[in-house]
């Protein structure tokens, strides 16, 4: 069985993948995993550190062949506002609930949640069911750089710390003079195969 121990970002010049693997957004945060390719082959992904992969990123097999990561279609909501200001307000409400969101110029895309749909419609949004690949924005605390996930979060250390209930600390920058604990309303599973 071939192994993968390195990767290249999407759009790398002169890259011609010979295989593909489709993964939904929540399965694209990887370090070590047996991957089932679209052509029926299997490869063992074995990276030094966890990586949050995006659509089009490339895995490099031990033999030099490339495997393209494709974002799988998912059941989503497409959210549109009356105008850009309204769309920004809707984005604020979604962010306040810590929801993964793909934010585009004229729409926001989220995973389907009928409670959230009711809230958005109550705020005047148009909400449509769609099925397409999902590439949510990477959170400020959960992706430092294009492909890393710093478990220690040392890059944040600017003082004025507050604690979250999901296993690691985050800190605020200068001018934020408070400490607090709060529940995100969701869980992060930092176990890696």
Curated annotation (Swiss-Prot):
Q: InterPro entries, from UniProt?
A: UreE (IPR012406), UreE_C_dom (IPR007864), UreE_N (IPR004029), UreE_N_sf (IPR036118)
Task: Give compartment(s).
Answer: Cytoplasm
Determine if Ubl conjugation is one of this entry's keywords.
no
- A Pfam family: UreE_C
Kindly list the GO molecular function terms attached to this UniProt entry. nickel cation binding; unfolded protein binding
Matching SMART domains, A to Z? UreE_N
Q: Positions of the region Disordered?
A: 138-193
Q: Which UniProt keywords apply?
A: Chaperone, Cytoplasm, Nickel
- Annotated Basic and acidic residues bias: 147-193
Q: Which GO terms describe its cellular component?
A: cytoplasm
Q: Please name the NCBIfam families in this protein's record.
A: PRK13261.2-6
Q: Which protein family is named in the record?
A: Belongs to the UreE family.
The record's function comment reads:
Involved in urease metallocenter assembly. Binds nickel. Probably functions as a nickel donor during metallocenter assembly.
Q: What is this protein called?
A: Urease accessory protein UreE
């Amino acid at each position: 069985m071939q192994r993968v121990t390195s990767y290249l970002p999407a759009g790398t010049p002169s890259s011609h993948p010979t295989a593909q693997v489709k993964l939904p957004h929540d399965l694209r945060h990887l370090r070590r995993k047996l991957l089932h390719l679209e052509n029926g082959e299997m490869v063992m992904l074995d990276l030094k550190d966890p990586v949050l992969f995006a659509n089009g990123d490339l895995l490099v097999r031990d033999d030099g062949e490339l495997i393209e990561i494709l974002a799988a279609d998912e059941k989503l909501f497409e959210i549109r506002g009356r105008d850009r200001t309204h769309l920004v307000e809707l984005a604020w409400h979604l962010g306040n609930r810590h929801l993964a969101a793909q934010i585009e110029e004229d729409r926001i895309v989220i995973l389907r949640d009928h409670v959230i749909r009711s809230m958005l419609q109550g705020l005047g949004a148009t909400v449509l069911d769609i099925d397409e690949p999902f590439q949510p924005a990477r959170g400020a605390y959960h992706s430092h750089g294009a492909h890393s996930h710093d478990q220690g979060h040392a890059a944040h250390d600017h003082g004025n710390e507050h604690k979250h209930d999901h296993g690691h600390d985050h800190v605020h920058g200068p001018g934020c003079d408070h400490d607090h604990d709060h529940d995100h309303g969701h869980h992060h599973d930092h176990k890696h195969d």
